[in-house]
Amino acid sequence: MGWLGDNSEDSTGAVRWVMDALLGKRESPSQKYRREFAQDDTNNRLQVPRSAGARRRRTGSLDSEFRARYELLPDETEGAGASLLSPVDLRPAGTAARESGTPGRAGWAGGAAGTLGGGDGGCDGGRDGDTFGRARGSEDVAFRPPRADNPLVSALFAQPSSPDAGLPGSFPGRAPRARDPTHDYLALLDQLARNNRDLHSLQQDLEAREERDRRETSYRDRYLQLRQELIQELKQSKTMYDNYTALYERYKALKDAEHPDYAELVSKLEAQIVDLTIADQQKDRRHQEELLRLQLQYEARIHELERKLNHQNSTYTANDTATPASTVDSGSISPYHKYNDTIDTQFLNHIVK
């Protein structure tokens, strides 16, 4: 049984698939796809390793492989949040499938060589094809917008034409310009993807700003707390310093009261010594002056006495010349014949002492 190009009743070619998808025949495309794949798996016995992240397919909707094969839009309830945030890929289906590793139309239609205009890929042997229990993984199928030349999208967005447009007898006017909304649809999807990316970046910026505001708030609170703690520490330090100063003043006063100031006492004694020294010097000077005065006085007295003595001696000498020596009275001897200057020296020393 072939996939495409077979004219038998049980065969399903590309045209039958499209007609069934658009017009809704007796069998849904998903049921035909499952039946064809199960038959192909039974005939070919594909043995491939099971995907670690595979999950069971949904029986009530189209499979992701089927949507990827025919480039159909996904369900609104399945993967809506992830598709809105993912960027729109405007590349051809074959190129995107080869780069992302997701089987496209050419990959799934490669079972029959030369069908559908000679597809550029064969049957993907790496996909899970076990009908009895092993499901295909659909989480690796990336969202791709339909191509502009997709007949399904063109048929969905085509404007209905009037059946009377080609009747004869009407005035031939300008042929209406066919407006293909496919490009607008793709541009809208691309704009939505860009908006989603901008919203995502804006959300990240807002989260970063909120995180920065939280950090700044925490830093400000911590700074105020540390500032208050430092103020308290400074107040306690000032109080402790004041108490220490007062205690030191009291200790110094007690020490001065118990022990006199020896330095002051020494200075007083030194002053007394200086005063006594000056007094002694003055006393010595007075004694020297008194001694000099007495010496001069005694010298004057001595000179006077010597003068008198010489005068008397001269007188006696004259008398002696007049009278003989034998007649001189022994009782008239001068009282100074026994004078000695030692007596005067001892007397002066006694006065000085």
Swiss-Prot record:
Keyword field contains Hydrolase: no
Protein name (database record): Spindle pole component BBP1
Major localisation: cytoplasm
InterPro entries associated with the record: Bbp1_C (IPR029330), Bbp1_N (IPR029328)
Keywords attached to this entry: Coiled coil, Cytoplasm, Cytoskeleton
Coiled coil: 187-318
UniProt record similarity statement: Belongs to the BBP1 family.
Entry GO CC: cytoplasm; spindle pole body
Region (Disordered): 27-64, 93-135
Transmembrane segments: none
Key word Cytoplasm present: yes
Subunit structure: Homodimer.
Localization per Swiss-Prot or TrEMBL: Cytoplasm, Cytoskeleton, Microtubule organizing center, Spindle pole body
Function: Component of the spindle pole body (SPB) required for insertion of the nascent SPB into the nuclear envelope and for the proper execution of spindle pole body (SPB) duplication. Connects the central plaque of the SPB with the half-bridge. Required for proper localization of CDC5 at the SPB and for proper M-phase progression.
Extent of Basic and acidic residues compositional bias: 27-38, 125-135
Superkingdom: Eukaryota
Comp. bias intervals (Gly residues): 107-124
